[in-house]
Amino acid sequence: MPLSKLTLFYVRTLALGALLCSSFVAQAKQVDVHDPVMTREGDTWYLFSTGPGITIYSSTDRVNWKYSDRAFATEPTWAKSVSPKFDGHLWAPDIIQHNNQFYLYYSVSAFGKNTSAIGLTVNKTLNPKSPDYRWEDKGIVIESVPNRDAWNAIDPAVIVDEQGAAWMSFGSFWSGLKIFKLNSDWTRPAEPQEWHSIAKRDQVPTGTHSSAGPGEIEAPFILKKGDYYYLFASWGLCCKGANSTYHLVVGRAKNVTGPYVDRAGKDMNEGGGSLLIKGNKKWVGLGHNSAYSWDGKDYLVLHAYETADNYLQKLKILNIHWDQEGWPLVDEKELDSYQSRRQK
């Protein structure tokens, strides 16, 4: 039976709608972030990224994201006194709840220098529409000084141990990754101070504390799972487009301060670290992760550079699975299957 004009109208309308829909999906932009961390308030997720003032996005499903705010409208007042070459970009945040507030740690530095400091700003809520929304900067938590310190005060991540004490891991290049106990209000190191080295690669030669050295390791993040603390770290180089060699390794320990060992039993302080994920031709420069347990499942949050988009950094959230020996596994195929969408 021949189609009526009305039927033809509906067919053409549906076809046009499908075409427009597919075009929208194809053109939907992914969220471009670096060094992502996340938290949740109510039914909303908040994502924090390196950028001017620390970029914040919000989502109710961890796929569709809207720009929310920046934690700083202008740079911290003390930033240039610590790092004269600071360019306004706050690096490598960490977000955690404490005392009914959200604690946002961040890094002030200049590329390749350890003229660096980790700062803290706090807020009662992450909802920018709330009358209680206001970031209050608490200043410097720790600072590294060239020719004094053989470490770099960037890339903070806070973990609470089984006794309720808060510890901050941090570090990039130089003599590797460190961890120290925070005081009761999480604003400074606890006294007397307790510091530990948790991972390093090549040693920095004596007398060259102003140089990063060859030890390509940074961005520690610790996740407690079962009987172990799992230390994730980024090896290699970021921020070099097609030449980026960033990839993720992991070790574990029974104590938050270590020693962290890899699958072969090698101490991460002696260069140990088991490969977790390296990427492929489509996705390079994988790294600077965080890791979380949400609603009974475990997730790895990281950035990856997309080759097809001129190596622009994209948000990736991957499922963490665990093998019979209790080691984390992630599926490289999820780099393709997880596609964030930035909403207007």
What are these regions (language model features)?
Residues 2-14:
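Bacterial N-terminal signal peptides that target proteins for export
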Residues 5, 23-24:
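Compositionally biased regions
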Residues 12-23:
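Bacterial N-terminal signal peptides
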Residues 26-344:
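Carbohydrate-active catalytic/glycan-binding domains of CAZyme proteins
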